[in-house]
């Protein structure tokens, strides 16, 4: 079933369901009691009606609207269902010739020949008429006026039946130029038979005249319709004796404007629908008309009749019909399509131009009851009584045009209709009050040009209840009364167009789904002058129509979720809100959803509460203009632009205020939100944001208080007004704050321009630790904001501030325009809180800010900050007065770049001026600043965390005062290419910040001196470089450049020192370059220092810093001698190491004065330095494989970072003030490593030497191997924490010497916090002890040998663990000791409490030592040396005594507790207690063990930064293609130390310029040390690449072509591959075959060969089968002729690749004899397709096919039959073939012809079963097939065009089949065919082809078509039919030589009765 059919059937089913309530009315009408009731009950006198039975009285009520209509409706629905079925199902469409509208005599209605027919009253009469000139009802004669049928031949438009007037009429048509329906003849135009032979398309019968006529026609010049003779006057019968000849009957069809169509040929009236007086609509119906008893009658489909007493046609061509029902009651079908039916209580008043007055009340109730019907045009009706209409009744119907109606009094309508006023041009005045409920409708006004005025009040309540419904066009409505609409009611519902509404009354609307005014029509004009109150989900005005214009001058208050003042769903409308608008509690104000609407607000709007929105601009291309003020608070939104491509103009002010909610919490709000895309928003008014919080106030916290939000994409926003923010946050309640955002821009591609500036007034109370952030502009995303105009910021805040003029991140952009002016007035609150905010903040890569305007700050304020890869520039003027702010903390960077990739540029033309009247003062440390510990210090430009700051060429920085610094970096880079002017004297400023005087301030530390540039930090936080290539001028006082710890300052430009007249200075006051706190300054070779002041000096340094001078120094314009006193500091004679060798390089340098470094360096080669090395800045890396030898001392000073060794480091001594990292595989050898301060030595590799710890803070963490080599020296001495981790080792290779330390770990300074933990292995040999401690005065500190720890002692001269006072020892691991008199653990000699605990294993001697005799004698496991010492061998402890004469315990103790295991394994003399042992011996006596506490854990190493790259590191090249060109040139990569790696290829661009199969690509790679040439490959599998190096070390590549036949792996393409190899050249075809993979080549060869182009051949075969099915399904028309057609758009007419066709099938069967017949078949199909859809395949684009068939059937007795058939099909097809691979995308067009010949012969026998209900026919036979396909040549694809020769195939198939035909009971039937058989023989010719691009070469083509399979056909059809339902199901599947086709179709037909 096609979708259209399905949709229509569903619609019909729904309609049927809705009409289910007709059934009772139909049943009531069919009651037998009807036969006893008179037909004219309504016309009977009251006394006679009283005598009627209740059934008669009841019948009209039940039957009132429905009964006699229902039959016609049901018939119509059934007809529609049938029509749908025939249209969309599978059956053919057949022409249908309607019966003649006559019985053979004169046409109806008949005339008797007289002049009049009854009934007549003397005036206008009813049919038949004589011949008067007045309008009459049928029949008419020939008058000139408009008449009703039948008409004569007048000049006016008439209604049926029509004759032949000059006006357009409805079919039958005469001979118009358009296509018409059959019959056709053989004319030149497409027609449907039968036609004569005229040139025009005509409808039968035609004569052949010059004009198109409708039969019968003579040959006259005028178009006429029957009956006509040929006379001068057109007339229609009946005619009497006039001059005209009588003509045949009129069968014209006329359609009227109110949905009535008369068909004179069928004598029917068709009604499109019936509107009822209660507003509902019935389906239409078809009724017959006739004359009965001299009166017109209408007859419904089920036989009910209506009498017609009047038929009029209005000026609007509406047919008005009225009369009486069978029961005599009045009925009318009026000009608006209403079916008006009187019941027995209805008062009926009819007649035109009458006046009716009534003050009688009305009380009517009951379904379908009607109180009064007033019918007639231009009536004047005055009704003043009260009325009550309930329970489905209709109070009054006024039907007629031009009526004037005045209605007053009180009306109550409940579930009913108050009044229906139907007709055009009516005027209605309402003066009373009306109450509507229960789904009722007060008034329906249906008609054009209606005028309505209401001065009464209305109360409408309940779902479905409606005040006024206006259905017509051009209505004019004036309402002065008040309306109340509640609970789903609707005040007014207007469906007509061009309505004008003026509402001056007040309106109250409440409750969900309640609507005051609902407009569906177009071009409405609505003026609301009254006030509106809307709540509870109600809607004030809803406009669904287009081009509506609405003006609200009254005030509107709308409240509650779901409520809305105005909703515009239509398009191109306009609305003006001139009154005030109040939106609260989640309501919406004015919403535009459609397209092209314009909303304008000139009043003031107030919006408050969450989810409340004042104005919503949704939809597309809408416009909103606001000239009034919008006040927003309490989480409301003033205006929401959620649509796209809209224009918003906001002229009034938008006031966004934070106010307290019901819980006393200050809440948020949003002024304007733009969430749609591509909108234009122009804000010409001001946006004012205000918040004022007292000390104890509470704030919501989120979301922020926001002025304008732009959240969509591609929007343009212009703010011409001012953006004003006033935030007074004095709340001191903890955690209470509410952020403020003036403009928030998210999304991408938005463009925002602020021309009026931003004004921010701010104050805060930070004592609670939280304060609101005030942001003027927030940009997130790829959008641009431009700020122009004058902006001001006044803030009283903490240091750093909480006011940000602009935050930009995530790729956004901010531009402060040339005319932008920003004035900042700031004062700081004394507090310990501070922020890192700035006036302009950028964050993230791709984010930028550019200032082109003027920024002035009165008071200290950071102006610009760039973070995390963002870039900020200044080309305008920035002026900061860093004046006293009454705060102890106000340090600031005016511009700052923080984070790698971040940069701040002071661009050409830019000026940054910094003036301070303060002096530096000590304060808390903030490490990002170069002067870490000082406040009142200010930086014009500063880089931190490895950002960059640049003062560009042409840019200027002015500095005045003490503690001011120009271009600086604590960590990062600072570059000056422009000009820096510094005057270090402290200014005195007047009230206007003019400098009145200056004075010198003596700094307490020299680094506090103002400086033009600064690099590094006063502490160990520096890692920076400052370079000057421009000009620095220092006047009176200050430094040109200063380098601090970790900083290097390099002068490559000019530094000039000057002094004002009369200014005298002192040493170190005016200096060119100063190096302090470990910094390095370098006057480079291009650097110049000009000293033009007497007290100026070139350099200054302290003892930890360095000066290097390679440049020029001039004194008063002349070169200065190095010995001149103006030199100041002396340049160092140490050598500055600026680089270390790369891999493979070696370097040796010698300096008697030593070396120093100033930045991070990495050694990858072999470096030997003869002299001391001072590392002053950055990291020092010795990388894996590298060797660094220092014949001297390496000192890692505090200004450096650390040393990280991965290679081999050999130094005489190393002293470090930073942690040191010896990483895995690293090796350090040194005599002494000195650890200074709080540093850690992480040894993960090998360490040989000694370590000295000089404080109680050093830590040593060993996970590698450590060895002390010098005799007598300890591995570690001093005070330190030591962690020997699991698997790590400590050992000594030297020997103990007298007076030596003779121990591996020597703790020489005791402290109760020091920790020693061994979890690895310590091996002490050659007389060494493992651990030795001095005596301490602290409480005992534990030393651990943990469970994984092993301590070995071999012949120690002193105890292996030799503890002093103040240490406990806990052994949880293993201790092995050997040697005479050796002691494993010895406690300190002390009266302190000391615990020596073993819960592990102590071997006194070893098992191996026992065997080889090396254990010695006199050994002790644990020995005490004090009377407070306790020895404890715990329950887990084991002591094995292997040595002779040795002991587990000994010495002086308080007690010895043994709960463990002691094994005496010696040969002799061993015991538990050594002689002389003292102390209580508790051996397994229940004494508790001492618990060893958990050992402390070692610190973690953390991460080490990435070192600088190896300059000689091979560059790994991958994913690189060497491009080649047609001229033989190629791209060249120049590189040294290059390794050619994976995926490096050479492309085949050269092939387009040469047909050579071997090509050399020269110098593809040039440089030194290039490796990996063998890795080069080709981008194409067709070419082989071989890289090689020439004599210069450059790489050439030889490209050799492979044969296609060798590369291709698909055997089906070998033939074309060989042909292409043979014809190889360099055209487009061949270059396209340079594909990347074998699979791609296989695919390309298949495509170019045409082997995959099979669809056209297959579709032709399918098309032949489709014709067979279409012909078989053709229904017979007559005499054996069958006809069937299918057209494009029908699913049955679809082939693959979006191909469709039109197909016609004709079949003529001729009975030759009683047992023989001959069938002739012909068909034609026209095809239309989109061509190929698959690469390599072809597809139909057009063409046509013809089918010829001849069948002969001979029947024999007993059901036997012999059938023979012959088919010939010819297909002339246009097609295209797609070639698409790589960069190729070609379409080759061609046309070809295919012919198909088939002969089939079969024998069959039919068996009849089940009483002829079932027929079974088995059959068998043979089929011969022959297909011929002509050759073809392609075009439009250039080198890819194929030329294909012709081909043919022949096949013989066996046929075995079975047919079933079943005709069952109850409407069921079925058919089925199952046919199959093997292919007996199949042969196919070999096709060859050639390609245009491979001239002279041909190749075989195999399309893969095969025979030999089993072919088959299966069909099934099931049918069911009943009186009102029919179902057809058909399915088929066909297969032949692998080509298949299948289909399924389901048709359902339902007839509604």
From Swiss-Prot:
Sequence repeats lie at residues 101-103, 104-113, 114-122, 123-133, 134-144, 145-155, 156-166, 167-177, 178-188, 189-199, 200-210, 211-221, 222-232, 233-243, 244-252. SMART domains: Autotransporter (SM00869). Residues 1-27 form the signal peptide. The gene is bigA. Residues 101-252 are annotated as: 15 X 11 AA tandem repeats. Residues 141-177, 185-249 have a biased composition (Acidic residues). Keywords: Repeat, Signal, Virulence. Residues 31-50, 88-258, 1496-1517 are annotated as: Disordered. This is Putative surface-exposed virulence protein BigA. Residues 1649-1952 form the Autotransporter domain.
